[in-house]
Amino acid sequence: KISRKEQVGIMLLENIQREDLTIQEQAQGFQMMLDLGDTEDQIAEKTGFSKSTVRHRLNIAKLDQEKLKEKQQDDAFQLTLKDLYELEKIKDVEMRNEILDKASSSRDIVSRVQNEITNAKKKENAKKLKTKLKKMGVEKAPEQYSQQMYNGKWNTVIEINLTDDVPDEIELPEQKGQMYWY
């Protein structure tokens, strides 16, 4: 005799192997199998789908299903698998849902994903750079002086673009007095 869990698993497997399932239905089925205790590898083995397809579908299952359905039904939007795979580049599922929600087109998804990736890299690099400068004795400039940077009252000794990787070594010229970053 098989357990209730095994019965549900068999029914899910039979349904997933139907050819008329949508990507969203496959995603939900894979998620249910995962919830029942199967691993991604086991799901791939049982269904005959590749591991990468299973992983992609499970990422689709993490999205806001109502918003996803709304975008799929919008004839002007034309949501593609490529768009959904593009969203996977964002680790934070809430941010994926926000991008999906705000996007006005397929191209807009790609643009928003790229912007988010760039912004995340800048934040990460800023954090690394601040830590490195602090260890070097460079302090954050007081807020009241922040605008002076733009009117020539400060001597800029180095500029670092946060879209680039933070250099391993930062060489600062010898200066009299405290150095600040902004």
Each language-model region and where it sits:
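Extended amphipathic alpha-helical segments with heptad-repeat/coiled-coil character used for oligomerization
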Residues: 89-124, 136
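Amphipathic, charge-rich alpha-helical segments that serve as recognition/docking helices
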Residues: 2-104
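C-terminal helical accessory/scaffold domains
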Residues: 118-182
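Extended aliphatic helical segments
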Residues: 8, 54, 93, 110-113, ...
